[in-house]
A protein has these predicted regions:
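Active-site-proximal N-terminal segment of extracellular/periplasmic enzymes that hydrolyze or transfer
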Residues: 132-192, 432-433
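Juxtamembrane/disordered regions of integral membrane proteins
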Residues: 2-111, 121-131
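His/Asp/Glu-rich, glycine-adjacent segments
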Residues: 134, 216-383, 519-526, 531-532, ...
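Short, structured active-site-proximal loop/turn typified by the sulfatase FGly-forming signature C/S-X-P-X-R
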Residues: 174-211, 216-220
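Active-site neighborhoods of enzymes that stabilize oxyanions during catalysis
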Residues: 231, 238-252, 260, 264-271, ...
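Metal-dependent active-site segment of extracytoplasmic phospho-/sulfohydrolases and closely related
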Residues: 397-435, 567-570, 575
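A long, amphipathic alpha-helix that forms part
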Residues: 347-348, 375-416, 440-450, 543-544
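Beta-strand elements within well-structured catalytic alpha/beta cores of enzymes
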Residues: 153-173, 213, 367-373, 393-396, ...
C-alpha cells in the first residue's frame, strides 16, 4: 500500500460514516415533510420517520442486489426508470410494515422515492459531499480488492489512458482557456502535465486511430466502412464482426494493453486480458453483464442514472429547439430517437466507464485504456464548440477528476494520460449546401444503378450495440422481443444497415456501384470485380464521372490510380503525382497540410482502397468542411481540426522532438512510456522491433 493511500484511509472511514448519517437524516426529514404535503402518506411522529429511513437503507443494502440481478436488463433499457419503480415498491412495503406509518397508494411511494433521491442529491451537493466519489472509493474498492495482488505497492507504476473521442487539440486548448475543463486545466497549471498535439492518418476516425494506437498497425483501414471486392463483403468498423476482423488482421498479441491490461469501451482490445463494452470482443466475452450489475447494484446509482438521463434528454430537446428558433447554421435534424441514443452515451456509458476504470485501478491492472464517446456524439449533431457539446465535455472532465482522485488511493501508483483519437471539423453538409448527395452525383454522372447508403451516419449505434450485447448473457423475454432480428452470433447489432454489415443481402447489391461515406471522405467502388479500376478504365467506362467529381465545389480532390502515372490526387485546377511529387497546375493537396501527400500515397497502397477516393473541399477562410453524411461536426478525411488530436500526459514523460504523425507513431511513443516505467521485457522487445520498422519505412 502506498503511504499516500494509507494516510487517506482513516479520513475515508470518517467520511463514510458521516455521509451515511447525513443520508439517513435527510431521508427521515424528507419522509416527514412528504407526510405533511402528500395525501395518502401518514407518519405519526419524527421518530418513526427516522426508523423508516434506517429500515429503507437496510432493505436496500440487503434486498436490492438480489432484485437488480433479475431486473437488470429492464433497468438498463429504461435508463434506470425500472429500477426507480422497483425501489418505490420497496419503500411502499417497508413503510407499511412499521407501526404508526401508512402509505395508501403506490403512486405516493413513487413520489416519496423521487423526493428522497432529489433531496439527498441537493443536500450532499450543498455540503460538498460527492456521492459518486463515496461510492467509487468504497463499494468499488471492496469489490476490486478481492482480486488485487498484495504486492502492488511495490509494483511498477501503471498508466490509465483516458480517451476523449473526437476532441481536437485546438478545441481542447480553447476549452482549457475558457474554463470548460477545470480539472485538466488544473493539471496543466500545476505543471504535473503537458499538452501536445499529433496528426492522425487520412482515415481520421476511430477504427484507424485505435487500431494504430492500441495494436501499432492500421494498415489497410481506408475508412470507417469499406467494401472488399474479393469476398463481396462490407467491413463496418462499429459492427462486432467488422471490429473483430480489424483486430484479427492487426493484432500480434503484444498490443498496448497486453500482459494483464484492461480495455473499456473501445473499438479494439489492444490485446487486453480484461474487456468490457469493447466492440471487437463482444463475441468472445463469457462474463458479459457483470459491469452492468456492478453499476446498478447500488440503488443510488439507479436513481441518479434515471434523473441524469431525463435531464440529458431535456437538455438535448431544448438545445435542438434553440438551434431552430435562432436559425443556427449549420445544423441537422435531431429527433427523439437521437436524444435517447445520446442519453446512453453521455450518461450510462460514461458512468460505467468511470466505475470500471476505478475498479481496474483498485485491482492493480498495469495499464487501462478507456474511451469516453459523449463529446464526439454530441459534436456530430450539434457542433464542435456549441454550448451543449462543451457541457458534455465538462461532464467528462469531472469524471476524470473522480478517476484521478480514486487512483490516488489505489495500492499501485498510477500515471494518468488523457488523449483523443482524432478531432472534428465543422461545416454545412454536402447535401444541405449543394442539394444533392455524393451518391446522387455519381448516379447522374454514370447513368448507372448506385446502391443507396444503407448504413446511416451515427457511430453511436455501435456503442449502443455494445451496450445491449453486454446484456444478452442475461437475455429474457423483454430482450428477446427487442433484439429479434438483430443478432450477429452472440452479439446484438442495432442501427441502419445491420443486415449488410452482418453479410446478409450482399448479393442483392453486389453488381451496383457502391458509394460509401465516412464523414468528409467518400469511397466509390464501380464494380465487384477484384482489383482496383484505373483512371484509364474509369474514363473509358464512365467518361463523365471524373470531370463531374473534380469540378464540383464540394469536392477538394480525388485519389485514382493511373496505369501510366501511378497514384494521382486530382483537383479542379491541378494534379499531384504522388510517387514523384510533380505538380501540374495548382496542387489540390495544398489546403490539407504539409503531410497530405504522404497520407494519401500511403492509402493508395492499401489492398482495399476504393476505385475512387473522394475528399470534401476545405474552406481555409472559415475552416469549414462539408461531410458526405448528415453531420455538423465530422471526421474521416483530410481538412481542418479533424486531423489534429492531442495527448495530455505527465511532464516526466518524454515527447519526441519530431512531429508525431500517424497513430502508429503515437503507439511507439506510448509503448516507450511503459518501457520507461519498467513494464515487462516482452514489451521492450516489441518497442525495439517497432523502432526498427519505423527507421526502415
Amino acid at each position: 500500500m502506498s503511504s499516500k493511500s494509507h494516510r487517506k484511509r482513516p479520513l475515508m472511514h470518517i467520511q463514510t460514516y458521516f455521509r451515511a448519517l447525513i443520508s439517513i437524516a435527510v431521508s427521515a426529514g424528507t419522509l416527514y415533510l412528504a407526510a405533511a404535503i402528500l395525501p395518502g402518506l401518514y407518519i405519526e411522529d419524527p421518530l418513526r420517520a427516522f426508523v423508516a429511513a434506517i429500515a429503507i437503507s437496510v432493505a436496500n443494502a440487503l434486498l436490492w442486489p438480489l432484485v437488480i440481478r433479475f431486473a437488470l436488463p429492464v433497468a438498463v433499457l429504461t435508463l434506470g426508470l425500472a429500477g426507480f419503480v422497483i425501489n418505490a415498491a420497496l419503500i411502499w412495503v417497508v413503510v407499511n410494515l412499521i407501526e404508526g406509518m401508512d402509505v395508501t397508494a403506490y403512486w405516493v411511494a413513487l413520489v416519496v422515492a423521487f423526493m428522497i433521491t432529489l433531496t439527498n442529491t441537493i443536500v450532499m451537493s450543498l455540503l460538498g459531499i460527492d456521492d459518486d466519489d463515496f461510492y467509487y472509493r468504497n463499494v468499488i474498492r471492496r469489490q476490486a480488492r478481492k482480486h488485487a495482488d498484495a504486492s502492488l505497492s511495490e509494483a511498477v507504476p501503471g498508466i490509465l489512458f483516458l480517451e476523449i473521442d473526437g476532441l481536437a487539440e485546438p478545441v481542447m486548448r480553447r476549452a482549457i482557456r475558457d474554463g470548460n475543463v477545470p480539472e485538466l486545466a488544473r493539471w496543466l497549471r500545476s505543471g504535473s502535465h503537458r499538452l501536445e498535439g499529433w496528426e492522425c492518418d487520412w482515415s481520421s476516425q476511430t477504427s484507424a486511430s485505435q487500431s494504430g494506437i492500441l495494436h501499432g498497425s492500421n494498415e489497410d483501414i481506408p475508412a470507417f466502412r469499406w467494401f472488399e471486392k474479393e469476398t463481396g463483403t462490407f467491413v463496418v468498423s462499429n459492427h462486432p464482426g467488422g471490429a473483430a476482423e480489424i483486430e484479427r488482421r492487426h493484432s500480434d498479441g503484444r498490443g498496448l494493453l497486453a500482459g494483464g491490461g484492461a480495455s473499456r469501451g473501445n473499438l479494439v482490445t489492444g490485446d487486453a486480458e480484461h474487456t468490457s463494452f469493447t466492440i471487437s470482443a463482444l463475441h468472445a466475452r463469457p462474463t458479459r453483464g457483470k459491469d452492468y450489475y456492478a453499476y446498478f447494484a447500488n440503488p443510488y446509482t439507479v436513481f441518479r442514472t434515471f434523473i441524469l438521463s431525463m435531464l440529458d434528454i431535456g437538455r438535448e430537446l431544448y438545445a435542438a429547439a434553440q438551434q431552430i428558433r435562432r436559425d443556427v447554421v449549420p445544423r441537422v435534424h435531431r429527433g427523439i430517437r437521437y436524444s435517447l441514443l445520446r442519453a446512453v452515451t453521455v450518461v450510462i456509458l460514461r458512468d460505467i466507464a468511470v466505475q470500471t476504470v476505478i475498479a481496474d485501478a483498485y485491482a492493480g491492472r498495469p495499464v487501462v485504456y478507456s474511451t469516453f464517446v459523449g463529446y464526439d456524439e454530441v459534436a456530430h449533431h450539434s457542433g464542435i464548440e456549441r454550448y451543449d457539446a462543451l457541457d458534455v465535455l465538462r461532464g467528462i472532465d469531472q469524471a476524470f477528476g473522480r478517476i484521478t482522485h480514486a487512483a490516488e488511493t489505489a495500492d499501485r501508483p498510477y500515471r494518468v494520460v488523457v488523449l483523443s483519437d482524432h478531432g472534428q471539423s465543422q461545416g454545412a453538409t454536402f447535401l444541405s449546401k449543394y442539394g444533392t448527395t455524393l451518391q446522387e452525383l455519381v448516379h447522374g454522372a454514370c447513368e448507372a444503378a448506385v446502391m443507396e447508403n444503407p448504413f446511416g451516419s451515427d457511430e453511436a449505434w455501435g456503442q449502443l450495440s455494445a451496450a445491449v450485447s453486454e446484456l444478452v448473457i442475461r437475455k429474457g423475454f423483454v430482450l428477446e422481443r427487442i433484439t429479434q432480428g438483430h443478432e450477429s452470433g452472440d452479439a446484438i447489432v442495432l442501427g441502419p444497415g445491420h443486415e449488410l454489415a452482418s453479410g446478409e443481402g450482399v448479393e442483392g447489391v453486389r453488381e451496383l456501384i457502391k458509394v460509401l461515406a465516412s464523414g468528409s471522405l467518400g469511397l466509390i467502388y464501380l464494380d465487384a470485380e477484384p482489383g482496383r479500376r484505373t483512371l484509364e478504365q474509369i474514363n473509358a467506362t464512365f467518361p463523365h464521372l471524373i470531370p463531374r467529381l473534380v469540378k464540383h465545389k464540394g469536392i477538394g480532390f480525388i485519389l485514382v490510380l493511373s496505369e501510366q502515372d501511378g497514384p494521382l490526387a486530382i483537383g479542379a485546377h491541378g494534379v499531384h503525382h504522388l510517387e514523384t511529387g510533380r505538380i501540374e497546375g495548382i496542387d489540390p493537396l495544398l489546403p490539407f497540410g504539409p503531410n497530405a501527400a504522404r497520407h494519401v500515397l500511403r492509402t493508395s497502397g492499401f489492398a482495399h482502397v476504393a476505385d475512387i477516393m473522394v475528399n470534401a473541399s476545405f474552406d481555409e477562410q472559415t475552416c469549414e468542411i462539408g461531410a458526405f453524411e448528415e453531420l455538423v461536426g465530422s471526421h474521416g478525411g483530410l481538412g481542418g481540426e479533424q486531423m489534429h488530436p492531442f495527448v495530455l500526459f505527465p511532464s516526466e514523460f518524454p515527447w519526441p522532438e519530431e512531429p508525431v504523425v500517424s497513430a502508429e507513431h503515437l503507439h511507439r511513443v506510448l509503448v516507450g512510456w511503459l518501457h520507461d516505467l519498467g513494464h515487462d521485457i516482452a514489451r521492450v522487445k516489441h518497442l525495439e522491433r517497432l523502432q526498427e520498422e519505423a527507421a526502415t519505412s
